[in-house]
Curated annotation (Swiss-Prot):
It is a multi-pass membrane protein. NCBIfam families: kup. High-affinity potassium transporter. Belongs to the HAK/KUP transporter (TC 2.A.72.3) family. The keyword Lipid biosynthesis does not apply. Keywords: Ion transport, Membrane, Potassium, Potassium transport, Transmembrane, Transmembrane helix, Transport. It comes from Oryza sativa subsp. japonica. Residues 1-66, 122-190, 250-256, 332-337, 401-438, 485-488, 541-811 are cytoplasmic. This is Probable potassium transporter 16. Residues 88-100, 212-228, 278-310, 359-379, 460-463, 510-519 are extracellular. One of its GO terms (molecular function) is potassium ion transmembrane transporter activity. PANTHER family: OSMOTIC STRESS POTASSIUM TRANSPORTER, POTASSIUM TRANSPORTER 16-RELATED. It comes from the Eukaryota. It holds the Pfam family K_trans_C.
Length: 811
């Protein structure tokens, strides 16, 4: 029962209704709490005890070290397997000069330090959205400080949700933040920021297709050194077999792989660093000259255009860097910085230096191919081969998990058709799995592996995804610095100039080879972007149509007071995307079926641009006039990482907070202005002896729905005098009984049954629309809608309790 659950949460609440400057004291045993301003009489906004701010709070060093160890297993595997294919792709046409090896090594060292360590680990991680990273989190952070969302469903109450403005509002004197906000809220800027976000998202998903192919194929290629009779076809089919098994086990919740096999990645990084030191000492210590950036200049002087083109292969050094930022949610910034600085950086640099030393003595093409496995001492080949396969799979896991999470986030933005999202762990809310996404990732990865057959072509496609995501991240990071961070403008200029200039050079080198592979991820990204744009465009148009055609209050009153309208027992939950007003489908329902339930609640499921919304701040209510008709509007707010409850659980929570609202609404309507304060500790005894001073009116320790106001008359000792005192206040016993009666009515109708009413709106283009709009709306969108999951499945609504109402909108 909802009332019983309400009682479990806390049976008493102190309500203070005051005029002017009057006030009152709390009981001696109570810790006084500051009053909370009520937003308006007909809106419930309950400020509960707020959870602690910050990502992980104050961490102990032991916790940081433990998180750092797990971080190695989940985030560093992809970066740790890049040495498998960097040199063999960079020098695939041979080494022209022995100092070219030192030049490329110098590029690798400074590129890795600049982009992985400086940009991501020490700068970008601080631009997280309450512990979530990636371009999606940057967009969410921007949308909290500027109205860049294309759907007009923002509400003033949203900004009061915990963690909505964790970074603090920029001071009014900070002119650049105000200027940036005004520029971003212009329509062209909104579209541009949205375009960049979904473009980066589409590229990241395309990268999730390419990454498993490159990593696993590079690892399996090492077999040719010990089994030279293996053909390319056999290597490809072995790779495909591993990929199929890898994607097949995703449904079991393989985020656990990262935790279980963190020791595997640690052993891998330790071994490759040890082998790198061994090769350095054995072959050529002189490659340490690569720490002198002069060799980069000499390299470009010697190779000119060819050296510039080879930059595309050098950026493979930091593939997987985006995972450090995107998968921040499980870890703290300190743990990632610690593990990256003291484990990842030295291990990766040692193996690149060791391979360079080996290649200085073995410059022929035979040794350049599979340079990594050739540089390994013979007794360690098989252990390293097995570790390479395992580490590659673990590295792919982080990317695939990112794809599942990204698709879930896209749905909260209404940028992608509804697909099935499963939670594979009850303990970790971020462990997601989507059968549809997993199938297409597996299919495309296998097709790409079978089509290109070698890493050379796939790597070129991989490069374009990496560098474009880097460029977009730099742009969004700069916007965050200007809008949110209180940083000196010259530091922002330095950040933008340094990273945008260097990344543009890398991008130009990759685009030069456009016809040799990079078109593939752009083609995949283009298809994804068309789907995202069409779905979001029609969704925005449909929302605006409903907003323009909301039912007026007079029309609602007229509908509810119709003589032929029948009220049947039970509660009707009417789902709508509209957060303002009554949707136009409501009068359509009454015209077709002039019968509604005794209690009607219009529910709008809304996702805020923050990861999580506490359940105590989830619901906003407003009662629709006339009040005796018991019709309410409710906005249920979720973060983009929050899980939607099962239908029955949702109803239980909804009814609990609806009863709170009924109680508070009646109390708030007694006097104006109103203040509400919540005691910081629970009180189990009545304290009605103190009288309010001046014009203050008190109803202290009001009972929650679980307890009856009529129970007050059952206390024999001294209760009659206290009731007499209470009846002199403005909140009379009759009014309190009215509150109880309304609450009991709600619970009684819930017991009579709950029916879920869903509007099934079909959208078509207006007859006079142009051909492109007709194709987009009538064909592409409706095809996507018919092949996506139905709303009742997304909300876990039982079919026996479902009522659908069909309507057609012309947009």
């Amino acid at each position: 029962m909802a009332q019983q659950q309400a009682g479990a949460r806390g049976s008493k609440l102190e309500i203070v209704a005051a005029r002017g400057g009057s006030g009152g004291s709390s009981s001696a045993g109570d810790a006084e709490a500051p009053p909370l301003d009520v937003l308006r009489q007909d809106s419930l906004y309950r400020d509960a005890t707020r959870p602690a701010h910050g990502h992980h709070g104050q961490e102990s060093w032991m916790r940081t070290l433990r998180l750092g160890f797990q971080c190695v297993g989940i985030l560093h595997a992809d970066l740790g397997t890049s040495p498998l294919y960097v040199y063999q792709n960079t020098f695939k046409y041979g080494i022209k000069h022995e100092d070219d090896i030192i030049g490329v090594l110098s590029l690798i060292i400074y590129s890795f330090v600049l982009f992985t360590m400086v940009k991501i680990v020490f700068i970008a991680l601080h631009a997280n959205d309450d512990g979530d990273g990636g371009t999606f989190a940057l967009y969410s952070l921007i949308s909290r400080y500027a109205k860049v969302c294309l759907i007009p469903n923002q509400q003033a109450e949203d900004e009061l949700v915990t963690r909505y403005n964790d970074h603090g509002k920029p001071p009014a004197t900070l002119r650049r933040a105000q200027w940036m906000k005004s520029q971003l809220e212009k329509k062209p800027a909104k579209i541009a920021v949205f375009f960049l976000t979904i473009f980066a998202t589409a590229l990241a998903i395309s990268d999730c297709v390419l990454n498993p192919s490159v990593s696993v194929l590079s690892a399996v290629n090492g077999l040719k050194l010990r089994a030279p009779h293996l053909t390319t076809d056999e290597v490809v089919w072995i790779t495909v077999g591993i990929l199929v098994v890898f994607f097949a086990v995703q449904r079991f919740g393989t985020d656990k792989i990262g935790y279980t096999f963190a020791p595997v990645v640690v052993v891998w990084l330790l071994l490759i660093s040890g082998i790198g030191i061994y090769d350095l000492v054995k072959y050529d210590v002189g490659v340490l000259r690569a720490f002198n950036p002069k060799y980069i200049i000499d390299y470009f002087r010697r190779n000119k255009k060819d050296g510039w083109v080879q930059l595309g292969e050098v950026l493979l050094t930091f593939t997987g860097t985006e995972a450090l930022f995107a998968d921040l949610g499980y870890f703290s910034i300190k743990s990632i910085q610690l593990s990256s600085t003291f484990v990842l950086l030295p291990s990766v640099l040692c193996t690149y230096i060791g391979q360079a030393a080996y290649l200085r003595k073995h410059m022929d093409q035979q040794h350049i191919q599979n340079a990594f496995f050739n540089s390994i001492p013979r007794p360690l080949f098989w252990p390293m081969f097995v570790l390479a396969i395992m580490t590659s799979v673990i590295g792919c896991q982080a990317m695939v998990s990112c794809a599942f999470a990204t698709m879930s986030h896209l749905q909260t933005l209404n940028c992608f058709p509804r697909i099935k999202i499963l939670h594979t762990s009850r303990r970790y809310s971020g462990q997601l799995y989507s059968p549809e996404v997993n199938f297409f990732l597996c299919l495309l990865s296998c097709v790409i592996t079978l089509s290109f057959r070698t890493t050379g072509f796939i790597v070129k496609a991989h490069e374009i995804c990496v560098v474009l995501v880097m460029v977009i991240t730099t742009i969004l990071m700069t916007i965050v610095m200007l809008l949110v961070w209180k940083v000196n403008i010259w530091w922002i200029v330095l950040f933008f100039v340094v990273f945008m200039s260097t990344e543009t050079v890398y991008l130009s080198a990759v685009l030069y080879k456009f016809t040799k592979g990079p078109y593939m991820p752009l083609a995949m990204s283009a298809v994804l972007m068309v789907i995202m744009f069409v779905w979001h465009y029609v969704h925005v148009k449909r929302y605006k149509f409903e907003l323009e055609h909301t039912v007026s209050p007079n029309k609602v009153r007229e509908l509810l007071e119709r003589r032929d309208l029948k009220r049947v027992p039970g509660v009707g939950l009417f789902y709508t995307e509209l957060v303002q007003g009554i949707p136009p489908i409501f009068p359509h329902l009454i015209e077709k079926i002039p019968t509604i339930h005794s209690v009607i609640v219009f529910i709008s499921m809304k996702h805020l641009p923050i990861p999580h919304v506490d359940v105590s701040e989830r619901f906003l209510f407003r009662q629709v006039e006339p009040k005796e008709c018991m019709v309410f509007r409710c906005v249920a707010r979720y973060g983009y990482r929050d899980t939607l409850e099962m239908a029955d659980d949702f109803v239980t929570t909804l009814v609990e907070y609806l009863q709170y609202y009924i109680r508070d609404l009646n109390l708030y309507n007694t006097v104006e202005p109103l203040k509400m304060s919540c005691p910081s500790i629970r009180i189990d005894s009545f304290s009605w002896d103190r009288r309010p001073s001046g014009h203050g009116i008190y109803a202290e320790e009001m009972l929650t729905p679980i307890q009856s106001f009529s129970e007050l008359t059952m206390h024999p000792v001294g209760m009659s005098s206290r009731l007499a005192q209470f009846q002199t206040t403005k909140m009379s016993l009759e009014e309190m009984l009215k509150i109880e009666e309304d609450q009991k009515l709600i619970q009684r109708e819930v017991d009579n049954g709950v029916v879920y009413i869903l509007g099934e709106s079909e959208v078509v283009a207006k007859p006079h629309s142009n051909l492109l709009k007709k194709v987009v709306v009538n064909y592409i969108f409706n095809f996507l809608r018919k092949n996506s999951r139905k709303g009742e499945k997304m909300l876990s609504i039982p079919r026996r309790k479902l009522l659908k109402v069909g309507i057609t909108y012309e947009i």
